[in-house]
Amino acid sequence: MEHTYQYAWVIPLLPLPVIMLMGFGLFLIPTATKNLRRIWAFPSILLLSIAMVFSLHLSIQQINGSSIYQYLWSWTINNDFSLEFGYLVDPLTSIMLILITTVGILVLIYSDDYMSHDEGYLRFFVYISFFNTSMLGLVTSSNLIQIYFFWELVGMCSYLLIGFWFTRPIAASACQKAFVTNRVGDFGLLLGILGFFWITGSLEFRDLFKIANNWIPNNGINSLLTTLCAFLLFLGAVAKSAQFPLHVWLPDAMEGPTPISALIHAATMVAAGIFLLARLLPLFISLPLLMSFISLVGTITLFLGATLALAQRDIKRSLAYSTMSQLGYMMLALGIGSYQAALFHLITHAYSKALLFLGSGSVIHSMEPLVGYSPDKSQNMVLMGGLRKYVPITRTTFLCGTLSLCGIPPLACFWSKDEILSNSWLYSPFFGIIASFTAGLTAFYMFRIYLLTFDGYLRVHFQNYSSTKEGSLYSISLWGKSISKGVNRDFVLSTMKSGVSFFSQNIPKIPANTRNKIGSFSTPFGAKKTFVYPHETGNTMLFPLLILLLFTLFIGSIGIPFDNGVKDNRILELTILSKWLTPSINLFQENSNSSINSYEFLTNAISSVSLAIFGLFIAYIFYGSAYSFFQNLNFQNSLVKKNPKKSFLDEVKKKIYSWSYNRGYIDFFYTRVFILGIRRLAELTHFFDKGVIDGIINGVGLAGFCIGEEIKYVGGGRISSYLFFFLCYVSLFLFFIP
């Protein structure tokens, strides 16, 4: 067994040979390399598959033995300092290795078809393979300095992939925004690492955990200083995992290709922050004040992400805010000490969200022939609808991913989210209320995405009403792009055939000839008309969807209790995940060591599922085809007429819609306070530098020049005059000296 662990260092290095070969090929024989570019996908997938098999073997050994293996190499600088580096294999590492390799392989397979017509096909595969290498290196790191090194590589790869289509100004601005926002967290992480190195003289995890176990309880170290350094480490996780208030980069990261959006949101970049917090949880758990702050940040993030997803029109941005909210659940779980629940939700969410993002890519792929290749149209749910008839496989997989994220049993996210909700109620009723209410919101906005995309009728004709300036409203306004004033914010979607908005006083009127076009898109070619419909994607893109569907259906079983024998007349029940993980730092570990209370489990499950079903029902009323039924019966109109507070309710609806659609005005606040403030400070500094500093220097030079000119004319070039003035100055000097 130990012989196998000795070669675990190979796993992060396996994708590197293909990267190097593609680089050499593009440098030495660029024409041949580009002509044979589709061949390079096979070795990329093959080597990552080998890494997956190796990771699976390590995971099986971890489940059976739950042992921790660490290998270190020491590089001695001098007698007082040596740098150690190596790799660590424990249950957390094995979980992340399986997650990264499985999702990475499916994304690579999907990308082969999705990016096949892109000129940057080879560049994309180089970036994404290096992304996988960086993340694999991060999760196997044995100390903080190695984590920071791979942490920066992950950030660099995300910058390159978000700005992959860098010729588009919005994409270029989005990658800059992600880079600068993460710089804030990375700087905090670096300061935290340096702070703990100053305290302990080491960067190894075991020394940090020694602080938690021995020094802090015995007052052997300043707890305030330790809390400050730990907070700086947490700041790095806040930026990487898009937690409030450093979440603003995540929606704009959707400017990259859809496969990389799936990888970022499922298994790599945003998972890095959760991984760092889970890795250092033995340290954080000894600092109760910081743990409370972590849980508070997670609670704010999960609720904020859900509210911001309520009115988004871009399908990928809606899923991005969903990711932000689910990461908030994980952060909340870690903050209350529920280590197992957080990692369980990380696993289930990764496969469900990868399924949803790849499904959205399939939808975008099918819409592009109809509306064009601009993301403002191909990703706009205003123009979708009725796709269930045209892309049935994508629709089925997307529905399963949606229901999983809503928390509907027996799909994956039900088991993990229910565990987080239960633990939240045990820790604090306040956190429990917010988390449960957000679970209902999650069901609402996720089913809204599904209904607007697949239910009702195709709304391609609305592209005439969708101004291109609208894109600036949810694009990179933080980086100097003006916000359009001409957007109709009262335009709220429904999937019904005979109308466009609900609960709106001003319903846009659609010309009759336009209304007749619903269901198809007519493209004129001379005297003929070719009707273009959405179509299902190829098998290469459907295969990853079906595999992820299986994960979504069955991965939750690792958290289902099973019989583990009888002790003290009680049936002991464990889960595969509890055997996999080390439960010693889980504050709720007693649940895994005692008999399961079936009544309590059913009560919690019924409560969470009821909230989810209620959210689904409300979403179906607002956005589903059933709305046309209510409208035809005049049920809704009569209800509104009888309501004396109609204007107040309309105003509340508009405020909520405006809050959500404009990202809670957080980007606007950052623009006014930070971006414009820094620019004004830069202008003031520039003025001070040019007007004051340069003025003093130039003034001194000019004064010297003028004085010299005056003295030149006084002397006249005669030596006798120079001697006369010299003697005068000497006389005055001697006269004033006592």
From Swiss-Prot:
Transmembrane segments: 9-29, 39-59, 89-109, 125-145, 147-167, 185-205, 219-239, 258-278, 280-300, 327-347, 354-374, 396-416, 425-445, 542-562, 610-630, 691-711, 717-737
Primary localization: plastid
Enzyme class (EC, first level): translocase
Listed EC numbers: 7.1.1.-
One Gene Ontology term from the biological process aspect of the record: ATP synthesis coupled electron transport
Pfam families, alphabetized: Proton_antipo_C, Proton_antipo_M, Proton_antipo_N
Gene Ontology terms, MF aspect: NADH dehydrogenase (ubiquinone) activity; quinone binding
Disulfide bridges in this chain: none
Cellular component, GO, one term: chloroplast thylakoid membrane
Keyword NADP in annotation: yes
Domain of life: Eukaryota
Catalytic activity field: a plastoquinone + NADH + (n+1) H(+)(in) = a plastoquinol + NAD(+) + n H(+)(out); a plastoquinone + NADPH + (n+1) H(+)(in) = a plastoquinol + NADP(+) + n H(+)(out)
Topological type in the membrane: Multi-pass membrane protein
Biological role stated in the UniProt entry: NDH shuttles electrons from NAD(P)H:plastoquinone, via FMN and iron-sulfur (Fe-S) centers, to quinones in the photosynthetic chain and possibly in a chloroplast respiratory chain. The immediate electron acceptor for the enzyme in this species is believed to be plastoquinone. Couples the redox reaction to proton translocation, and thus conserves the redox energy in a proton gradient.
Subunit structure: NDH is composed of at least 16 different subunits, 5 of which are encoded in the nucleus.
Family: Belongs to the complex I subunit 5 family.
Protein name in the entry: NAD(P)H-quinone oxidoreductase subunit 5, chloroplastic
Organism annotation: Saccharum hybrid (Sugarcane)
